[in-house]
Amino acid sequence: MKFSESWLRTLVDPKLSSEELSHLLTMAGLEVEELDPVAPAFDNVVVAHVLDVVKHPDADRLNVCQVDTGSGAPTTIVCGAPNVAVGLKVPCALPGAKLPGDFTIKIAKVRGIESSGMLCSAKELGIAEEASGLLVLPSDAPVGQAIRQYLDLDDNLFELKLTPNRADCLSLLGIAREVGAITGAATSLPVVPEVVASIADSRAVVLDAPEACPLYCGRVLKGVNAKAPTPEWMKRRLERSGIRAISALVDVTNYVMLELGQPLHAFDNTRLEGAVHARLAKPEEKLLLLNEQTIAVDADVLVIADDVKPLAMAGIMGGEESGITLETSELFLESAFFAPKAIAGRARRYGFGSDASHRFERGVDFGGARRAIERATQLILEICGGQAGPVVEAKAVLPVRKPVLLRTARAEMVLGLPLGAERIAGLFAGLDLSFVCEGDNFQVTPPSWRFDMEVEEDLIEEIARLYGYDNIPSVSPRGALKMQVQPEARRPAYRLRQMLADRGYQEVVNFAFVEAAWEADFAENVAEAELIRLANPIASQMAVMRSTLFGGLISNLITNLKRKQTRVRLFEVGRTFHRAADAVPVNGFHQPWKLAGLAFGGALPEGWGSGARKVDFYDVKGDIEALLAPAVLRFEKLAHPALHPGRAARILFDGRDIGCIGEVHPEWVQKYDLPQAPVVFELDFDAVKAANVPAYAEVSKFPPVIRDLAIVVDQNVVLQTLLDGLKGQVSDLIQDIQLFDVYVGKGVPENKKSLAFRIVMQDTQRTLQDSEVDAAMQQLVSCFEQAFGAQLRA
């Protein structure tokens, strides 16, 4: 929101400097982004009247001018401006004047003729970036008056960076209210008398979509002179607010929007047919807008139409065919309230925006529509003449402002201030809030222009703003801190992160909303209908809540590969999102924490002491086992859409499924153009944080006995299944069984494979005898034979 300080001070004039006012607004939540003077410093420049112009005898591009500067005698000035002419009133810098750029005007001879001053352009005065000639002033400009005074150049431009909830401050009226409430200064708000109708002409208004447009005011004006010039004071205020002056009728609607915060629109009444309707667009309806863009209007877009055709996108932009021109003499003036939900996002959908949509989608004072149309009528009649008909008002159910309870004790507790009910009542009165006191509590009814007061915390914020954030004392919080004992059965999250970092992994943090394609490629058992889609995504590629962390890690890998990183280790801890009927704390959704990782490139960093080898399934499996040690994990074959069908496993801990590991599926390796298949894993983070409490076990002082055993089994026998079959079936002397070789080929029958195991046997009380070892080995072989049809390899 941009405006001039002089305009604001006509409504409220606190005894503060510009800088003090800027600081006060910022500390009250209305951040002043820029505070700039309208014009740079200069002096001794006055309004001058050009009396005579003759060509310079010695220069083709120069003129010798006789100028009245109000001193009583004509002044000779040599001027090279192409637009200098007799009768013009222009700025004149007198001798001794200091112009922007540290340029001092002196009496000097120009090609033999003495020049006592300089006629100035807007650029030379520093009030415009470009200028093609002298700054021409209105014919009634008083000769001799200081140009700074005449053009009101001792003014400042404020630009506020407003938050979306403060739509009430998108007008001078709203800002004046705020300044008055903050400073206690008296406000002189615009008095808008009702314009008495002088003609009976009117046009019926029909609310076909009352929820989107519950209030519409319209008025016919006739005999209007659209070519009448806009007053200089209005043009100046508009331009200093960042709005270009166009024509008197357009300028009036823009001026009222800035002054009162109510966007208006003017239609050429002769181009309308029948009643005016506020309705939703019809199928295949098209509209040529004022920006010369033709759009196909969607069915959820509110339009203003007559009985035959659409006229405008309601609250956004008017149509070209019903727009006013300099030939317009009869107009239909609109002032309406459009519900924010009916306007929000519609302009962006078509790739443009407007000052009107910026206000309506945030919320416009529904109590100010009638006042705005009266104010605009008043200005149009003063500037353009004409006659006004009666205001036709169509009204449905307007928003109901529900009272909000404020407890004084609650406000004092949140702010840490001993305010008292009387002080709070004074602050609310300064904001023009309607309230009822019930002891130390308040029932506050928000005004029609405040859409941001809905809960008690909103009112506490208002108290803090008016009291002054910088007046609230800084008090350090105090509390009795109790040392929290970390249970042995839980691993702290920071320790798990540190362990992964120690193994060469780097932590990443990705958005929880992802591409729908990632879910299709990497998610397990998630149908298209089960995707959790965002109602209003920030981008099309961020439209779905993730159910797996794999997609983000693959995207991170691609980014690293583009930056020539050949060895990548990544992990992420984050929530995933799943539909579940009984999930808490969010009904219908389960949001578990997951730990996922990715390894790509060499198994080890390049070095002279080790050969180059690509990371594989077993490297990452070892990382997971080290992370969860001393827990013993089980790995079972797994079919997963994201993983290689023969190089993927489900991870189980104490019989519970806690995640998966595997190479990325070849189809996705090809689709995402990866040089090799990365190995990924995803674990239930809560399960990973669970730890086995260490228990004492005696270390044997007697030597172990190691035997090797090779058996032949069917090709389809899975190692884990084979080891599971031994539990409880073999001697207690056997401490460990490790697979050290798998062989298929010569000497092994077809469809068979040879598995070689290293058996470690030991007792804590004595040295084992050969007979005991032989018996244990025979028992082991018998188990292999009976359970899996295994045979000793010859």
From Swiss-Prot:
Residues 399-474 form the B5 domain. Its EC number is 6.1.1.20. Mg(2+) binds at residues 452, 458, 461-462. Keywords: Aminoacyl-tRNA synthetase, ATP-binding, Cytoplasm, Ligase, Magnesium, Metal-binding, Nucleotide-binding, Protein biosynthesis, RNA-binding, tRNA-binding. Residues 39-148 form the tRNA-binding domain. Its main location: cytoplasm. It comes from the Bacteria. It is found in: Cytoplasm. Binds 2 magnesium ions per tetramer. Transmembrane segments: none annotated. It catalyses: tRNA(Phe) + L-phenylalanine + ATP = L-phenylalanyl-tRNA(Phe) + AMP + diphosphate + H(+). One of its GO terms (biological process) is phenylalanyl-tRNA aminoacylation. Residues 700-793 form the FDX-ACB domain. SUPFAM superfamilies: Anticodon-binding domain of PheRS (SSF54991), Class II aaRS and biotin synthetases (SSF55681), Nucleic acid-binding proteins (SSF50249), PheT/TilS domain (SSF56037), Putative DNA-binding domain (SSF46955). HAMAP family: Phe_tRNA_synth_beta1. NCBIfam families: pheT_bact, YtpR. Belongs to the phenylalanyl-tRNA synthetase beta subunit family. Type 1 subfamily. Tetramer of two alpha and two beta subunits. PANTHER family: PHENYLALANINE--TRNA LIGASE BETA SUBUNIT, PHENYLALANYL-TRNA SYNTHETASE BETA CHAIN AND LEUCINE-RICH REPEAT-CONTAINING PROTEIN 47. This is Phenylalanine--tRNA ligase beta subunit. It comes from Dechloromonas aromatica (strain RCB). The lineage of its organism: Bacteria, Pseudomonadati, Pseudomonadota, Betaproteobacteria, Rhodocyclales.
